[in-house]
Amino acid sequence: MSDFERTEFELPPGVGHSQNEDLNPQQTAGDSDIDTSLRPKSLDEFIGQPKVRTQLDLVLGGARSRGVAPDHVLLAGPPGLGKTTMAMIIAQELGSSLRMTSGPALERAGDLAAMLSNLMEGDVLFIDEIHRMARPAEEMLYMAMEDFRIDVIVGKGPGATSIPIEIAPFTLVGATTRAGMLTGPLRDRFGFTAQMEFYDTADLTRVVTRAAGILGVDITGDAAAEIASRSRGTPRIANRLLRRVRDFADVNADGKITVEVARAALLVFDVDESGLDRLDRAVIEALVKGHGGGPVGVNTLALAVGEEPSTVEEVCEPYLVRAGMVSRTPRGRVATAAAWRHIGLEPPEGTIGL
């Protein structure tokens, strides 16, 4: 056993069972500068998503060979998998300028009209969280996507007139974490939809190794795999955990990350071997120890761990369900055999997954 495995480190102070923000797949302000340096610049550099990369290579290559703008592209999938990066790569592969905005920023049709009227021929317009666009802006987008023109209403009341405005041919790339919330008319106007999938440990290990090389971090292969295995299948989380482990290694190990250093660092930052944090484990313990494994309603669970129901439902549950530790049933949440064993208890007969 190494010195790092024998040493006990004090866990960072937390309030209640609050989530470790390093495990939040959503982008945070602290990601921006580092993410920019780590983003791949081409489809060849992009790690993972082999099916999407192959499909996009054909879609973009076909458009280039014909000398036309490619079909509009919808990138769907959970946060943190590289949808924004893929939009940047699409523009790069086409040799086009990229204009970026988000659904929530397009509150009025006029907001979208101003952006569309400033596009140059061949530009790529990226709309993140496109499912959150206001309806007036979305309806204007229909005509822009199909006919490359928009109708602008001038005036009010009976005297209002509609003025058609031609816009330059462009390619729209939309990103959504909730494809089911897209309206049918909007979804149907995308010529190609790419479904981004969670990463396996092998691809995430490559992500960590590549990021370490760019950041100048001295890391062993098994340490990269250790970080990858706790990253919830999400590159954004893997890159964050690498930075936390690097901080630990700089202070405690002369900057060299071995697997022992990685494990010790992740213990300090409260990320266990399954990628669970304090809040995830609190939910499991509330299910198992407080309610015999369930079923339990989300409001009761939230009360037990001192969090809002939306936090339990939107932050904890997706990964716990995907990890096979929680099952959602019509009667409530149920702990599986894997959840019982994760906290060191033997599941009773009849437990899901036994």
UniProtKB/Swiss-Prot annotation:
Residues 273-354 are annotated as: Head domain (RuvB-H). Keywords: ATP-binding, Cytoplasm, DNA damage, DNA recombination, DNA repair, DNA-binding, Hydrolase, Nucleotide-binding. Residues 200-270 are annotated as: Small ATPAse domain (RuvB-S). It catalyses: ATP + H2O = ADP + phosphate + H(+). Residues 2-199 are annotated as: Large ATPase domain (RuvB-L). The keyword Flavoprotein does not apply. GO terms for cellular component: cytoplasm; Holliday junction resolvase complex. Residues 17-30 have a biased composition (Polar residues). InterPro entries: AAA+_ATPase, AAA_lid_4, DNA_helicase_Holl-junc_RuvB, P-loop_NTPase, RuvB-like_N, RuvB_C, WH-like_DNA-bd_sf, WH_DNA-bd_sf. The RuvA-RuvB-RuvC complex processes Holliday junction (HJ) DNA during genetic recombination and DNA repair, while the RuvA-RuvB complex plays an important role in the rescue of blocked DNA replication forks via replication fork reversal (RFR). RuvA specifically binds to HJ cruciform DNA, conferring on it an open structure. The RuvB hexamer acts as an ATP-dependent pump, pulling dsDNA into and through the RuvAB complex. RuvB forms 2 homohexamers on either side of HJ DNA bound by 1 or 2 RuvA tetramers; 4 subunits per hexamer contact DNA at a time. Belongs to the RuvB family. This is Holliday junction branch migration complex subunit RuvB. The lineage of its organism: Bacteria, Bacillati, Actinomycetota, Actinomycetes, Mycobacteriales.
